Amino acid sequence: MTVERTFSIIKPNAVANNDIGAIYARFERAGFKIIASKMLRLTREQAEGFYAEHKGRPFFDGLVEFMTSGPIVVQVLEAENAVQRNRDIMGATNPDNALAGTLRADYADSFTANAVHGSDAVESAQREIAYFFNESEICSR
């Protein structure tokens, strides 16, 4: 298998609930290397740009409002088959449908406040990583 990079966000609810360390521990136990990380607070413009593909959908405004409501932690994860493995660890987007032991089952507060975001494909991972990080901030190890 090929080593891939994927992009992940720990969302405002999980940051506010002090779940960052627990989520990072889960990533590392699952074999991911965290090769870039930073905490920031999205502006409305940044959130709208990041989620531009959802513009016009009924949940867009609420998502942007939520994602700008507090700090987030963005990270680049590296592992074999990273995109799919991270999606498996996150669980279903709707936490009511997430399997026990997944990040969303354990840390989500609601459908919107579902604790984490992860890239859905290698191509989107590349785009999302570039949105938040330049190459000098990414440290493969």
From Swiss-Prot:
It is an enzyme of class 2 (transferase). One of its GO terms (molecular function) is nucleoside diphosphate kinase activity. Its EC number is 2.7.4.6. Keywords: ATP-binding, Cytoplasm, Kinase, Magnesium, Metal-binding, Nucleotide metabolism, Nucleotide-binding, Phosphoprotein, Transferase. SMART domains: NDK. It catalyses: a 2'-deoxyribonucleoside 5'-diphosphate + ATP = a 2'-deoxyribonucleoside 5'-triphosphate + ADP; a ribonucleoside 5'-diphosphate + ATP = a ribonucleoside 5'-triphosphate + ADP. ATP binds at residues 11, 59, 87, 93, 104, 114. The active site is at residue 117. Its cofactor is Mg(2+). CDD domains: NDPk_I. It is found in: Cytoplasm. NCBIfam families: PRK00668.1 (NF001908). PANTHER family: NUCLEOSIDE DIPHOSPHATE KINASE, NUCLEOSIDE DIPHOSPHATE KINASE DDB_G0292928-RELATED. Major role in the synthesis of nucleoside triphosphates other than ATP. The ATP gamma phosphate is transferred to the NDP beta phosphate via a ping-pong mechanism, using a phosphorylated active-site intermediate. HAMAP family: NDP_kinase. Belongs to the NDK family. This is Nucleoside diphosphate kinase.
